Amino acid sequence: MKKTHITEQNFADLGLQPQVIDGLNAKGFIKCTPIQAKALPVLLAGQDIAGQAQTGTGKTLAFLTATFNHLLTTPAPEGRKITQPRAIIMAPTRELAIQIFNDAESLIASTGLKAALAYGGERYEKQQQVIEQGVDILIGTTGRIIDFYKQGHIDFKMIQAVVLDEADRMFDLGFIKDIRFIFRRMPAPTERLNMLFSATLSYRVQELAFEHMQEPEHVVVEPEQKTGHRIKEELFYPSNDHKMALLQTLIEEEWPDRAIIFANTKHKCESVWGHLAADKHRVGLLTGDVPQKKRERILEEFTQGNVDILVATDVAARGLHIPQVTHVFNFDLPNEAEDYVHRIGRTGRAGASGNSISFACEEYAINLPAIEEYIEHSIPQSDYDASALLEDLPAPLRLQRRPQQNRRNNNGQRQGGNRKHTRPRQPRNTQS
């Protein structure tokens, strides 16, 4: 869990329970971020909120702190069984659910509360065993949570606090029926503390809040710039024939320490991965079809620096806390303007600078006007010299073949990946 820009509001001055303060202090959280400073006083007064905040603003810590404090100050319902959760936190993706759980585990020890994780792609029995040992806070994706409910392993009759994170993404992924199924089996909104967070408070998100919350107060924290002033943006107009060669040439020139490459489809991601893996880059692939255990391993390797480049669909663009990403490449311009902001927001975090390089190709250049209208500025354009693009590139690997990821031989010398230039490059001409 990162420490983002802060305010002068101290957690210790909010009237939180000592156990909660102890957990925050142990992790070095002393002062609030803007979303925490705005949301926590409202929540500690027992008022529901619908919060608008981007990923990376500290909203996870806000709703975890409020949830812990509410459960510590509110008696557990009489007759509650240990398998009946008192709070539920719903996330749109497995990766986000895991991240929330990890953040909760880092703070929860001093409270005496127990958290459990429920998401698809992981062994059902393993998660069930944890729940059967007792759960106060259930964190997970809606599908697996409903599976446990229908099998009789949990119910929602004793819920005292609810968090819906990335509500707009829930709509995008088609999970709203699941959310309503869960809400309708809980106590009435007046009998629980309700928290909704979303990158945008669109009409449909506000309608959901109206249906299942008790007069929520809207709390809005917007960045000064949608794309962040520390992110250097750059746009190229490659032909389809030049697109892959331009990407590989830019990787050679930029030499990114840690980069994420976004493409719009699973097939395109696999193609990009195949070209980079064949060129001996340490590259990982993150799409919806990658098995969950492998996804977790890839994210861990990327976070630890054992993988330099992650090729991903938008499944990785929101909710994940991946530190020190130096470059984001939009191999395809996203179809939704908001996704551009979420993608490039993976870099330039926690005061660091970052680089965003986007391709307006023949297929996706049509998305550019909507993106620039949304971010309220034009993306600076750069030209490239087609004759300077890499040509000596190996044939791409197929996904079923395991690429050689080791960059060092037995003598400790580096092999492949970010190869030295075989000839001088022509400098790029950047237009303001």
From Swiss-Prot:
One of its GO terms (molecular function) is RNA binding. A motif (DEAD box) lies at residues 165-168. Residues 40-219 form the Helicase ATP-binding domain. Keywords: ATP-binding, Cytoplasm, Helicase, Hydrolase, Nucleotide-binding, RNA-binding. Its main location: cytoplasm. ATP binds at A53, Q54, T55, G56, T57, G58, K59, T60. CDD domains: DEADc, SF2_C_DEAD. SUPFAM superfamilies: P-loop containing nucleoside triphosphate hydrolases. Residues 396-432 are annotated as: Disordered. Residues 245-390 form the Helicase C-terminal domain. It catalyses: ATP + H2O = ADP + phosphate + H(+). Belongs to the DEAD box helicase family. RhlB subfamily. Component of the RNA degradosome, which is a multiprotein complex involved in RNA processing and mRNA degradation. DEAD-box RNA helicase involved in RNA degradation. Has RNA-dependent ATPase activity and unwinds double-stranded RNA. This is ATP-dependent RNA helicase RhlB. It comes from Aliivibrio fischeri (strain ATCC 700601 / ES114) (Vibrio fischeri).
